[in-house]
Amino acid sequence: MQTIAIQGRDLCVTYGSRQVLDHVDITLRCGEVAALLGPNGAGKSTLLKLLCGEMSGAGKLDYFGVPASQWPAEKLANHLGILPQQSSLTFPFTAQEVVELGAIPLNLPRKEVERVARHYMLKTDVLHLAASLYPSLSGGEKQRLHLARVLTQLHQAGQQRILMLDEPTSALDLAHQHNTLQLARQLADEEQCAVVVVLHDLNLAAQYSDRLILLHQGKIVCDAAPWQALTAERIEQVYGYQALVAAHPTRDFPMVYPA
């Protein structure tokens, strides 16, 4: 049986009088990719921030069976990494130096830091940018660079790793969208990493995820495999949009089209 990486029970977040997350129960397991889906304002990014400890809220949250409150921040940083949505932060560093920031919790020798950073830069297709200054990079290059940084951070966690991706494909071209999600899929399949990703593209989610978790008005309305989650009726319920759902012509996952 797959190890439970994260378990949240009765999770709630309120902004003023608005209930952003409404008594959410969620379980994420090692070796699987789970996609958080839903319209703008459904609570996807809020749930991700709550799960990673960036935001406080009500309810119970465990990492690998241990209450979140019992994890020292330094230890949790070795096991949980998050790639946030793009920010306006900048660094007066080279691309490789930015990736090496991920090794700060690891206390590795300098040569090993360089080796690990370059290993993940190669995986995310930014190694050729190693000497480039961070401010000179495009939005998509920065996104891939920060993914390499997060993977560097998790390098020593073995099979107790949680990778959280908040709209990781938003600034990427078609090829790098698929490359990024293929890498997430590979980490889950080959290294038993638990991956949770916020996406807007239902077709990408169906192609690369084991589970689709659909949120609507702060509640989980469906948590199921792609074929069970993506029905025309549910898409209209969640998005208010009439769609057709059909099989991919050569692979076993559903595709969503305009009705």
Swiss-Prot record:
<feature type="binding site">
    <location>
        <begin position="38"/>
        <end position="45"/>
    </location>
    <ligand>
        <name>ATP</name>
    </ligand>
</feature>
<feature type="domain" description="ABC transporter">
    <location>
        <begin position="6"/>
        <end position="242"/>
    </location>
</feature>
<protein>
    <recommendedName>
        <fullName>Hemin import ATP-binding protein HmuV</fullName>
        <ecNumber>7.6.2.-</ecNumber>
    </recommendedName>
</protein>
<comment type="similarity">
    <text>Belongs to the ABC transporter superfamily. Heme (hemin) importer (TC 3.A.1.14.5) family.</text>
</comment>
<comment type="subunit">
    <text>The complex is composed of two ATP-binding proteins (HmuV), two transmembrane proteins (HmuU) and a solute-binding protein (HmuT).</text>
</comment>
<comment type="function">
    <text>Part of the ABC transporter complex HmuTUV involved in hemin import. Responsible for energy coupling to the transport system.</text>
</comment>
<dbReference type="InterPro" id="IPR027417">
    <property type="entry name" value="P-loop_NTPase"/>
</dbReference>
<keyword id="KW-0997">Cell inner membrane</keyword>
<keyword id="KW-0472">Membrane</keyword>
<dbReference type="InterPro" id="IPR003439">
    <property type="entry name" value="ABC_transporter-like_ATP-bd"/>
</dbReference>
<dbReference type="GO" id="GO:0005886">
    <property type="term" value="C:plasma membrane"/>
</dbReference>
<dbReference type="GO" id="GO:0005524">
    <property type="term" value="F:ATP binding"/>
</dbReference>
<dbReference type="Pfam" id="PF00005">
    <property type="entry name" value="ABC_tran"/>
</dbReference>
<keyword id="KW-0067">ATP-binding</keyword>
<keyword id="KW-0547">Nucleotide-binding</keyword>
<keyword id="KW-1278">Translocase</keyword>
<keyword id="KW-0813">Transport</keyword>
<keyword id="KW-1003">Cell membrane</keyword>
<dbReference type="InterPro" id="IPR003593">
    <property type="entry name" value="AAA+_ATPase"/>
</dbReference>
<dbReference type="GO" id="GO:0016887">
    <property type="term" value="F:ATP hydrolysis activity"/>
</dbReference>
